[in-house]
Amino acid sequence: MALRFYSHNGCVLTVGAEAFLLQVLVVVVSLHQQPLNVKGVTEKSGCDYFQGNWVYDNSYPLYDTSKCAFIEKEFNCQKNGRPDKLYLKYKWKPSGCDLPRFDGQDFLRRNKGKKIMFVGDSLSLNQWQSLTCMLYTSVPHTAYTDVRRESLSIFTFTEYNVSLMLFRYAFLVDIVAEKIGRVLKLDSIQGSKIWQGADTLIFNSWHWWLHTGRKQPWDYIQEGNKYYKDMDRLAAYEKGLSTWAKWVDSNVDPSRTRVFFQGVSPDHMNGSDWNEPQAKNCQAQKQPVFGSRYSGGPHPAEIKVRNVLSRMVKPVYLLDVTMLSQLRKDGHPSVYGSGGHLDMDCSHWCLAGVPDTWNQILYATLSQH
């Protein structure tokens, strides 16, 4: 009997489906790249892109979302009726330098013939959609294909033969259907078969580790030969990330594949975190937290990510977007997401918006290596 692997959104991948997806991932030998490390570009340029503050810039946003028909409803805040636009006008200013302005044509030329894959949860979807729109509006009217199949989405700029891929695998490790129910296997990473062959990999995982009740997509957690009804979620997260890290160390050739980890994307559900205790969530927030410090302090999952990356042998670049995103309490859909007033969304980000900055940093880093 074929194993059935569950993605976070309920899609089922059988072994047969994996075989189909593997056919899609034709391995293209990339140009040799200088290996990246966890500190990344800061060592090369003397600039830390992740320390700075948000400043008003009337030339922003970088693109008009209405020009991108493929943007998901949940991120399209203006189309969903958000009345304010000031949140669109802020750019990230690193403390010691300027972040290069995004050049979509240059990005496509540099990555011609390449496959860039985002792997993770709906925050990966958020960043993937941001990058597709940033690129598409840089080369308007260019031909593209947008293929969706189960948990894999492939957006290809046909003129450049650049494929932006998204694989929805929220935990990075496997959830497998067994007789006792759905099992989150902290030591198993069979989904990695889909990732092989990509030239650039951008991983993300966090938010789904916290879900309980009806939103929890597993019934048991397995570590080794032991099954648990539950365990400390931060501990489980670190164990799952460690399995992912071992896969990278054992399977990635840094001369052919560049690996990034998208830092933990924060939510804004408690105004005390930004010195507004009267605010119960992100609704009606119209400006960032100004300055370069966030009173809520470091994110606990961020510490786990750093612990895991510090033990890795192969180079991984940390897109350390947590703090710069913590300052953007105004950037979420709130009631202008897919659920409207029935579903407060202070986890995802409006597009155009904060994920565009994540991709600017991704572009700057790739350009320097």
Name every feature range the model reports, one short phrase each:
Residues 2-369:
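A compositional signature for long Ser/Thr(±Pro)-rich, low-complexity
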